[in-house]
Design a protein with these regions (language model features):
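Extracytosolic ligand-binding ectodomains
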Residues: 1-185
Length: 185
């Protein structure tokens, strides 16, 4: 947040130099004066402001839990991308356990590949069958004065997981899919 504050101190607004952040979300904006941040952007796989039935249910469940447990901020409960990712992960694990009919890790791991879940993003997330990374949508949101985001761009659907960046020299020759013929140690 100090970076944004300094931009404001220098008289630079989002209309002059828009900044795209990859780690600023609803929780980071809680309790912060968002006026100087309005118009800056963030890229995530989920924003609380998304409008769809799955997100409405997700926010309602979280608000009830936060109130019941008397969590800090329960009077104005927030959801964010890391929470949505955890929520998806727990449900996919549950589905994999049910498919494997076991809690045994060696049985659950192969069962998790290919799992799908209608996520709070409004899209169906998918666990890649080979590398176990999620296929998820991408959203770009513009910071609003109330600390929420207005989605200004989104992918038409989930983006296939690419676990190794080709832009990092050490990763350029890494395979996105594990070698299933390699022997376990």
């Amino acid at each position: 947040m100090p970076f944004y504050k300094e931009l404001g101190n220098q008289g630079l607004k989002a209309t002059d130099v828009p900044v795209v952040a990859f780690s600023v979300g609803e929780e980071e904006l809680r309790g912060v004066d968002t006026k100087p941040l309005v118009g800056h952007l963030a890229a995530w796989n989920y924003f609380m402001s998304l409008k769809n039935p799955e997100n409405d249910a997700f926010k309602k469940k979280w608000a009830a839990y936060a109130k019941k447990m008397k969590l800090p901020g329960a009077d104005k409960p927030l959801t964010n991308d890391p929470m949505e990712a955890t929520y998806i992960g727990i449900y996919m694990w549950k589905q994999a356990v049910e498919k494997a009919k076991s809690l045994d890790v060696d049985k659950v791991i192969p069962a998790v590949g290919g799992q799908t879940f209608k996520a709070p993003s409004g899209f169906t997330a998918k666990m890649d069958e080979k590398n176990h990374h999620l296929h998820k949508p991408v959203f770009i949101g513009e910071i609003k004065a109330d600390g929420q985001f207005n989605v200004v761009w989104k992918t038409p659907g989930p983006v296939k997981a690419k676990p190794w960046s080709p832009f990092i020299p050490e990763n350029k020759d890494k395979n996105d899919e594990p070698d299933l013929t390699a022997k376990k140690k």
